[in-house]
A protein has these predicted regions:
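Non-catalytic cap/lid and distal C-terminal segments of serine-dependent acyl enzymes
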Residues: 1-248
Length: 248
């Protein structure tokens, strides 16, 4: 139990090579372990590799272990200058929007690797994708486009505005997975559009059929690692504890 590091890992066609950071909780089950995959792995655990402080996800998981089924946590480092391109589902500016291929690598290589080497579950309902900002929209898109792979998402302060907010039209064109756990949040001290769009997306997904939704409006939340670190326990409780259905 503890930390493991893979890499540098080569994600084909997605330079540069990167670290994959893994934490196995002390209370992890011997088999069928839930899995939480987080984008921007530099920010997931300690402060050292992060530009603005880490989430210390390992500490959050351990503190909640008596209340939730503790997941194995995987942080995938972003590609530096390629980050926007690999996390965007749609073209924007000079970025071609290559998230689909990155998600395919997660589905075809990363998850099977975790299942084989870390006793991670084969039940998609126990596999959650998460992130913040660009990682937030990537996590939401990943769940909606691959509901047979992921059973939940954590989308903190998702950048829904990118590509002229195209994700709204995209989400309205398809059914949302009814039983998937969808956590979305935003802070009142972020740019107003961030909060308004996050709230609006929560309602869109309900209209499209999602029923395990949790939207949290953080009255003091800013667009920062510190705010996401503070909100992470709430997201973990929703994803890996007993979820309550949305009421509208």
């Amino acid at each position: 139990m503890g930390f493991y590091f893979m890499g540098p890992v080569d994600v084909p066609d997605y330079p540069p090579q990167r670290l994959v950071r893994i934490y196995v909780p002390n209370r992890a089950h011997a088999s069928d372990r839930p899995l939480l995959i987080l984008f921007d792995g530099q920010n997931v655990f300690d402060d050292a590799p992060s530009f603005a402080g880490g989430w210390r996800a390992h500490e959050r998981v351990e503190k909640l272990a008596k209340k939730v089924s503790p997941p194995v946590v995987v942080g995938i480092d972003h590609g530096g200058g390629h980050r926007i391109e690999e996390l965007s589902p749609f073209p924007m500016g000079r970025s071609h929007g290559r998230l689909d291929g990155f998600l395919d690598w997660i589905k075809r290589w990363l998850i099977p690797h975790m299942q084989h080497h870390f006793a991670v579950t084969h039940d998609p309902r126990k596999i959650v994708l998460g992130g913040s900002s660009m990682g937030g929209i990537a996590a939401l898109y990943g769940l909606l486009s691959l509901p047979h792979v992921f059973g939940g998402c954590i989308a903190m302060s998702p950048s829904l505005w990118i590509a002229r907010a195209r994700i709204f039209q995209w989400a309205e064109s398809r059914p949302a997975p009814e039983h998937a756990r969808i956590y979305i949040d935003a802070g009142k001290r972020e740019p107003p559009t961030m909060h308004t769009q996050a709230d609006a997306m929560d309602k869109v997904l309900y209209r499209q059929g999602a029923r395990n939704l949790h939207f949290f409006s953080d009255p003091t939340g800013t667009h920062s690692e510190a705010a996401w670190r503070k909100r992470l326990p709430r997201a973990l409780r929703f994803q890996f504890g007993s979820a309550k259905k949305a009421a509208y």
